[in-house]
Curated annotation (Swiss-Prot):
NCBIfam families: h_aconitase. Binds 1 [4Fe-4S] cluster per subunit. PANTHER family: HOMOACONITASE, MITOCHONDRIAL (PTHR43822:SF2), HOMOACONITASE, MITOCHONDRIAL-RELATED (PTHR43822). This is Homoaconitase, mitochondrial. The lineage of its organism: Eukaryota, Fungi, Dikarya, Ascomycota, Saccharomycotina. Gene3D superfamilies: Aconitase, domain 3, Aconitase, domain 4. The keyword Lyase applies. Pfam families: Aconitase (PF00330), Aconitase_C (PF00694). [4Fe-4S] cluster binds at C335, C395, C398. Residues 468-494 are annotated as: Disordered. GO terms for cellular component: mitochondrial matrix. Its EC number is 4.2.1.36.
């Protein structure tokens, strides 16, 4: 069970009375809640999302769905399938996969959008599946995009998607919520992309890792919806699980414009749904709690560029322009910045100019509808006349697929969202991220540069960004620590119902793996990932092998791993969770976890706890000790009935005692059933 320190709040205290906007939307889509239960950060809830989108991974989801014994999608109006990732791939194998997805969607009556229609996230916005104040999920990390229109969008893994297809629901733990205040107004030439690139660069110490974000402040009201979508989209790269903007007049105007294009009979964007937004919108309570409060002054922001090869590195364009960084390729593609306003902005820069002879410039619209609008406006032809190479609407180079990838030694600048090493081609290439305007200007200049440089004008120096971060002690989000004694009421009264078959307590010796960012390959080596015939005993033997070959000789059944921050980062391999279970370990504790690992853990019946203070205490105790795996002699007991964790040494002296969030019966049921797949099978059997 994934619980941050700020989640350590007794559910009976008045501190939990107010709800923020994220919690209120989850409240709407949570099912099977106890009477009068208000949901808050840290709570595990069963959710029935308004919609669930999958893309090229729809066939693996369908295969898992059928493997569970499911025959029919329970609510075909909930599900959307789009083909967008590998649309340039015309091989027999890929076309067969696409045909399988289309056939399955037709048989099930699922809304289906074929290759060429556009990127799934853009379609979800255009067609109103992701709509203000609803909860929409997708088996893709950039589901955060939906927050740009006030829809709580968050990613799920394939097992979750199969569960939703079969039962209409899955589970979610409400993350800590960070308030990000945008103050002031953007200067001319500064865009939404500059906001999020700057945020990723100036708050680059995982301040919002695994948080939900709510954007507030007077700076929000003047941001176009396309800017909001760009910002929400890249909250993924910032480390967040969602990025939610408020409902305001500008958003309602956006939907009125969509209504004019779609006509009066659209099932999701129509007069009734827009009028419902006008009549009353959800908003955070005055006493809502936030884990932290970040502020950035938009008046002090200038055009920013991310990279190379990291979103945590960002610099003012004025600095990089002086460095004369030659480029080989430029990209105006992706769900981040290929909407009509982006294409028009690039066209305005390119008009009357030609792409530099040493540069290849690729352009793809976010959807076929966007391309049609860009063609009608003349912007598309302007970009093509300048020398850009058109690609079909889809993900393409952003995901490292198809034409125009970066080669060894090349430098690229892109309006996309990720510039990780090797993401857009060769691992020996350098990738930068910037706004459509800067990408277009760089394509003309042959180097990273600003639009004004095309006309021979100097680039103005950038002011220092004014920013701040606050961790409010009075908010109740810091929870109870060992320096803040637990009350007698907290420790004596059992308040959590425990299902038959679920343990009332979990305990074991803490085994310290003293490192941050232990990735899934360190937990379960990649060379074993596709050995489908490997036994459970063999999985136990190789558990943590790449992290420490001695792990298997130092640990035993019922031990509890305690590690640093971002444990389980990396790939989506489920064996990273199941190999720990194979060793007889039921619980992992860490400072924080990679989100996909957290979901895979619960989905496979492995419990997790986030207790940052505990890892910090152990790091003090073992400072200077170079062993990778240490038996600490500290024992953790998690009393599930009291939602209380106690850590004591061999002599019984209490080292730490923490009140933790309640593990509800919904999650207990998944664990008892052996994971999410087992739970789904049991639900399907009930319907037979």
């Amino acid at each position: 069970m994934r619980l941050h320190l700020h989640r350590f709040i007794s559910t009976s205290t008045p501190l939990r009375s107010g709800q923020n906007l994220t919690e209120k939307i989850v409240q709407k889509y949570a099912v099977n809640l106890p009477p009068n239960k208000l949901v808050h950060t840290g709570d595990y809830v069963t959710i029935k999302p308004a919609h669930c989108m999958s893309h090229d991974n729809s066939w693996p989801v369908a295969t898992k769905f059928m493997g569970l014994g499911a025959k029919r999608v329970k609510d075909n109006r909930q599900i959307v399938c789009t083909l967008d990732h590998d649309v340039q791939n015309k091989t027999e194998k890929n076309l067969a996969k696409y045909a399988n997805i289309e056939r399955f969607a037709k048989e099930q009556g699922i809304d289906f959008y074929p290759a060429g229609r556009g990127i799934g996230h853009q379609i979800m916005i255009e067609e109103g599946y992701a709509f203000p104040l609803n909860l929409t999920v997708a088996s893709d990390s950039h589901s955060n995009t939906y927050g740009g229109v006030g829809s709580l969008g968050t990613p799920i893994v394939r097992t979750d998607a199969a569960s939703i297809w079969a039962t209409v629901q899955t589970w979610w733990q409400i993350p800590p919520v960070a308030k990000v205040e945008l103050k002031g107004n953007l200067q001319n030439g500064v865009t939404g992309k500059d906001i999020i690139v700057a945020l990723c660069g100036v708050f680059n110490n995982d301040e919002v890792l695994n948080h939900a974000i709510e954007f507030v402040g007077d700076g929000v009201e003047n941001l176009p919806i396309d800017y909001r979508l760009t910002i929400a989209n890249m909250t993924t790269e910032w480390g967040a699980l969602s990025g939610l903007f408020p409902i305001d007049d500008k958003l309602i105007e956006f939907y009125e414009g969509r209504l004019q294009k779609l006509g009066p009979n659209h099932p999701r964007i129509n007069k009734d749904t827009i009028e419902a937004l006008r009549r009353g919108s959800l908003a955070s309570d005055e006493d809502a709690k936030y884990a932290k409060h970040l502020v950035i002054d938009l008046n002090t922001l200038s055009p920013y560029v991310s990279g190379p090869n990291s979103v945590k590195v960002s610099n003012p364009l004025s600095k990089l322009s002086q460095d004369n960084i030659a480029i080989n390729k430029a990209y105006l593609v992706s769900c981040t910045n290929s909407r009509l306003s982006d294409i028009q902005a690039a066209a305005d820069v390119l008009k009357g100019h030609k792409v530099h002879p040493n540069v290849e410039f690729y352009v793809a619209a976010a959807s076929s509808l966007v391309q049609q609008d860009a063609e009608a406006a003349g912007a598309w032809q302007t970009i093509i006349d300048a020398g850009a190479k058109p690609l079909p609407a889809g993900c393409g180079p952003c995901i490292g697929l198809g034409t125009g990838l970066l080669k060894d030694g090349e430098v690229g600048i892109s309006a996309t969202n990720r510039n990780f090493k090797g993401r857009m081609g060769s691992k020996d290439a350098l990738a930068y991220l910037a706004s459509p305007e800067v990408v277009a200007a760089s394509a003309v200049l042959g180097k990273i540069g600003a639009p004004e440089e095309i006309d021979g004008k100097p680039v103005n120096a950038s002011p220092e960004i004014v920013k701040s971060i606050d961790l409010p002690k009075s908010s109740g989000n810091t929870g109870a620590t060992s320096e803040e004694p637990i009350s007698e009421d907290d420790t004596s009264e059992a308040s959590v119902e425990v299902l038959p078959g679920f343990p009332k307590s979990i305990q074991g010796e803490l085994i310290l793996c003293n490192a941050d960012n232990i990735n899934t390959d360190g937990i379960y080596p990649g060379k074993y990932t596709y050995q489908d015939d490997i036994s459970r005993e063999q999985m136990a033997e190789v558990c943590m092998e790449n992290y420490d070959p001695e792990f298997k000789t130092k640990t035993k059944s019922d031990d509890i791993i305690i590690s640093g921050y971002n444990f389980g980062t990396g790939s989506s391999r489920e064996q990273a969770a199941t190999c720990i279970l194979a060793r007889g370990m039921k619980l992992v504790v860490a400072g924080s976890f990679g989100n996909i690992f957290s979901r895979n853990s619960i989905n496979n019946a492995l419990l997790t706890l986030e207790i940052p203070e505990l890892i910090e205490k152990l790091r003090v105790k073992y400072d200077g000790v170079n062993e990778l795996t240490i038996r600490t002699g500290w024992f953790l007991k998690w009393d599930v009935t009291k939602a209380l964790v106690t850590v004591a040494d061999l002599d019984g002296e209490v080292i730490l005692q923490q009140k933790v969030g309640e593990l509800g019966t919904n999650l207990q049921d998944i664990i008892v059933k052996g994971g999410l797949e087992g739970w789904v099978k049991s639900e399907l059997q009930k319907e037979q």
